[in-house]
Amino acid sequence: TFIDHAKPHCTSRELYKGILSGKARAVFNGKIVVRLDAQKTDAMQTNKNLLLSEEGRVDTKPELEIFANDVKCKHGATVGQLDKEALFYLRSRGIPERESRRLLIQAFANQALAGLPIESIREGVTELLLARLVGN
């Protein structure tokens, strides 16, 4: 991804989420540039990844290139697996493992999916995502 701030008072929020299963590989290479004239820019770049297997791999490289001196910019990246304690908690409440995994995967994806403005599309994408990933 590439975001180029060239004028003052720009704002950007980039959220890029990945969910990997099996032997999947993913690369995130995102860059935000804040030009000299783009004073008062407020930019945030976030990459979050969820690995559903031991074989999956994510390479993530968020970048900020800032030429202005009066800005508020940040970036970050995370790679993790399903929270075993959360999975245990759900299981201890009688929720089957498959449903527990589905709930945790959906919770992870919801932040990105919430940005889809048409509800029927959002629901369809959510169902496709869960159908593909829950059995892994």
What are the functions of these language-model segments?
Residues 1-136:
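Active-site gating/interface segments in enzymes
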